[in-house]
Amino acid sequence: MSPFTADSLTARAGPRVRRAGTPARPTPVSPLRPPTPTRPEPRRPHRYAQDVNAGETQRAPWIVGVSGASGTPYAAAVLRALLVAGEAVDLVVSRASRLTLLDETGISFRDAHWRDDLREWLARGADGKPDTFQVDVDPVRYWNAGDLAAGPSSGSYPAKGMLIVPASTACVAGVALGLSKDLLQRAASVVLKERRRLVVAVREAPLNGQTLRHLVALDDAGATVVPASPAFYAGATHIQDLVDFVAGRVLDAAGVPHTLYRRWEGELGGGSRDD
């Protein structure tokens, strides 16, 4: 009898190689265990509002930050003028500013109903009367101030610049020192490092040396400081006129056209001119 058996010959020859063009044998499937279905990869949520990439589908917005200083009518006037000018707006409302807004207007700004609350806020005049203005808030996107992973926290996020109206001394200090305790301060720091326009409408009186040094630091970093102090040469007859003047100066610093106040031409107060 030959010492070579069929099993030994197969073991020595190694695994059988399939010729080119020969169909592969199907993998046997146990009738007792069905094949495991392939699970689709979960979608990663977008960081952008409305589940879109703002840089690809929308024009670059102005970021408007509202801090806790008194002067929420200034912010409302700036927001209205930006929307009238056809600008897209990204809105960041700090926690402290919600308390100020509630105290000055009686409006509670809620994350879940921010669009309705914003519409009511912008419709109110500086004298507190509701339904003074009609405003379309659809071009506004709202970002929670606690979301440090939001779009405006990155330099790659498209933005024309940022307007902080009103700016509290705490907000001024945080931005001047490069802190990022919330999205408002982080967005301002990003705007500065990207060499975009930052307008800070500080609303405080009196100003001590520490705050003045912070304002100088912001100016040195490239920001424009606009004190929330109205002028009276434009013939103001209503509190809204005074608010609009400050809002207009903020927009002037940002380069946004508006018609909020009557500009000085040398004759507004009846003064004489040399002929």
Regions found by a protein language model. Name each.
Residues 4-46:
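Compositionally biased, low-complexity flexible segments
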